């Protein structure tokens, strides 16, 4: 049996612990109980078969292929189940011996292995056992013979093997990723009914009692208990089946191993009921208002606005197939979102620090997360971006703009704190008392002398107090000893000893030590300190995690924020007009202040895992593969703007990646990315500490080699404004000439001394495997699906119904460019009713129009949209041609 999977063996992590529901484990126990019959069989012809079963079921023994083959030669019928009611293939799957399946399939006797064989104990086929127990490796072996398997075979309860795949499980994701669900066809389950309880009025007297009973059953089901044999009835069925059975007044019996989630699964391949929202072009203004109100109505639920946009898009794209309506809806939605978060919406391009405004980072991170989910939903919608390539570019621009808005809000909060918390904040006394040549030394020396004299007097007074206390303690000790000898009271001796200890201990403490032992006062805590910088970066990290923003977008937000902060700090040090920062003493203090930020970065370090299920060839062409076929992509002529792509590097090269246009830059650990951005500042501070000690060109060259991120222009600029200490040597004039010659040789300009501030890198989009791993796996995967609560659905339906009735009451206005009537006319409503609200539509199939009045493949109804010009307004910079390079 040749493998169609090559070497794609998966580690089955579910083997080490129980899998499936409690009922699946009960069925597993029934099969294991049949092993007791093996020792009771006395038929010689069954000896080889029995030994083979014992080999399979012995969990303490490793797989012995040679022994298995020898015993298998003596077995005439590999499908025999007369001994225990269970065949060899069932035992192999139950005990997870996947490697034996191929040997059993290619048995020496030549008998054909029946892969649809049902056991007599539970009534499961091999595929049903593999799915219910989540034996992924067994599934691999079975699918190698997919042409021999009846995938639509049902058990006694009327369920197929597909119905036993637990949703959101690793097995479900594996089958979906490898396109194994293509063998699945829709089968109507004929589920047997049982008679209704006699006293139904007690059970279903009102809606509240039914709801309470349902939740009680769910709680008991989780605990492995039931109220009655019918307690599991229709609790995990689809909503449509559940409502149908409930309306019939009878409970249904389903397979207890069928553990579908109570809420169901969003079907991206079919247009199912309640998974799209009907609307018209005249509903768009009110839908946009509803969209913008969701942060207040549903705070931190970022899947709701994404689901609202996506379900409307599904209706326009798959139901009525109108490309203009899809693109207009997305354009207006993104414009409305961008306008609501833009702190500089009408201010134009950001060119100066004064133009920066502190926006609401909670709202901005909310919409960033919303758009990341919308991007994920559209990627799951097959070939959506190939049908609408302009949508991807617009989505890239909007996500990019919101990231810059969020970074701008953080940066403007940092700008006002850099001077007070980093440049002027000092904790080292020597830095405060340092004398500089440019100061009025006459007055400063007098002040310094007074401070030294005061400090000397304080120390002398402290010594005198210690001597007096010591003298008093000695006298008190002698006095206590005399009283103790006279009275003979041991307790007085202990008391005097305690007093002596207390007095002696007090000698070793002074006010200065006690001041450091106690926490700072509230006044001290309110003063600016480097902790303020840490708090702002911590707030950014918090809101990104709060809204479950994709890690690659989190990394980009933090990276740009640290980069803007580092470049601004670097330029502030070089531009210091008061010459406070350009000195070796202040350089030490600033470096010490930055260590607080370094500690926070180390404590909050994280690394975005690289996508595993994508090769370098496809990754280099991503995200262009979303809108074009691989053969049509030319890497030298990118068709998407403002987006970074993957550039492979040598695996043996462990150097840091400095190129932000390479998407690998953001797959480095956060502390390494921060190190790259902060390196120029750190190296400048190191230069300031050693510059005046250099006395030769050799020492200067070796120092420059150790500081590669600092250019000769910057080195010379720092020395021109350097603040020399009183006894510090001046920077060697020969070294200045050397730097000047270096600048002339390299044709550098002195204007290049400062780093570029507010640099905007390209956007990096997460790949589809990354998003699938993050959003489609795990117990919380249901919360990432584009479902909407009933309140939002009702709001959209009400908007559409009210507008529809208003349009019906208005006189019909014929269109000048088209002889067709308005989409919201009577023909539309009749057409919609004939289609059937409760039917599912396969979006991969071509839907033929049923009448000329409503052509689903035609755009006549949406060639002229009532676009709400006053509802959404883009910022002023969006009309600028240079927006792609620098929207700020």
Swiss-Prot record:
SUPFAM superfamilies: Ankyrin repeat (SSF48403). GO terms for cellular component: Golgi apparatus. Residues 809-823, 867-880 have a biased composition (Polar residues). SMART domains: DIL. Residues 462-504, 805-827, 865-888 are annotated as: Disordered. Keywords: Golgi apparatus. Gene3D superfamilies: Ankyrin repeat-containing domain. Pfam families: DIL. It is found in: Golgi apparatus. GO terms for molecular function: GTPase binding. It comes from the Eukaryota. Present with 3690 molecules/cell in log phase SD medium. This is Dilute domain-containing protein YPR089W. It comes from Saccharomyces cerevisiae (strain ATCC 204508 / S288c) (Baker's yeast).
